[in-house]
């Protein structure tokens, strides 16, 4: 990485809520630090069955008018937008089909929280909230696994063929010389 920085991650547990915060310090006296940062929480799914069609659901907040970009070549994305696969109740199934093209990337501050539900569509597992502009949700492609990753990001995966400087990447963060930037990566409220 071409910049010096100090990263501090803190976790706090209060009741049933686990909070993850990050501080990014720029030790330089002269250079602006350009960076992206995100979390990588994975949630185990209690109804995992490798032979099931759907092993749980996700309820985004808000859940109307959503669209995503999809990861493709080496985790990069193209410019096309796609409809979010949702049930009539506005739930996103956790299935091989949903993640057939790897990640669902909600950008533009579309989703500020995601509740994970058991396969019965009623029982809440947990609710992840965040303040990041991007929420990336993924599971392994072509194979159900016993978890789903719900990742808030202050930044965005690269576009296919990307050749733009770090300072003008979508949702890039910038710390001025000597500055410490604070980010709430996520809060997870456990419901089970």
Regions inferred by a protein language model and the residue ranges of each:
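Active-site/ligand-binding surface loops and adjacent short beta/alpha elements
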Residues: 32-34, 42-45, 49-130
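Acidic, contiguous internal or C-terminal segments within carbohydrate-active enzymes
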Residues: 1-41
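Glycine-rich active-site loops that engage anionic ligands at enzyme catalytic sites
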Residues: 117-161
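Short, structured beta-strand/loop micro-motifs enriched in basic residues and often containing a Trp
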Residues: 160-168
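A short, structured loop/turn motif at beta-sheet edges
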Residues: 12-17, 28, 47, 118-120, ...
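Beta-strand-rich interaction surfaces with strong enrichment in secreted/lumenal proteins
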Residues: 8-10, 169-176
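Beta-strand elements of well-folded, non-transmembrane domains
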Residues: 13-15, 24-28, 41-45, 62, ...
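Short Pro-Gly-centered flexible turn/kink motifs
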Residues: 22, 173-190
């Amino acid at each position: 990485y071409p910049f010096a920085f100090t990263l501090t991650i803190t976790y706090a547990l209060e009741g049933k809520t686990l909070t993850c915060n990050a501080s990014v310090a720029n030790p330089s006296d002269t250079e602006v630090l350009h960076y992206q940062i995100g979390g990588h929480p994975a949630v185990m799914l209690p109804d995992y069955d490798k032979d099931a069609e759907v092993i749980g659901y996700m309820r985004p907040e808000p859940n109307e008018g959503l669209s995503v970009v999809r990861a493709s070549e080496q985790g990069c994305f193209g410019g096309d937008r796609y409809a979010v696969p949702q049930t009539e109740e506005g739930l996103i199934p956790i299935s091989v089909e949903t993640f057939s093209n790897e990640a669902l990337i909600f950008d533009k501050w579309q989703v500020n929280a995601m509740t994970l539900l058991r396969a019965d569509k009623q029982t809440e597992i947990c609710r992840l909230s965040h303040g990041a502009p991007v929420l990336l949700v993924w599971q392994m492609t072509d194979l159900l696994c016993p978890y789903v990753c719900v990742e808030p990001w202050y930044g965005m995966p690269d576009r296919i063929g990307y050749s733009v400087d770090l300072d003008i990447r979508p949702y890039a963060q910038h710390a001025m010389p000597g500055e410490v930037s604070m980010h709430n990566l996520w809060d997870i409220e456990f419901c089970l």
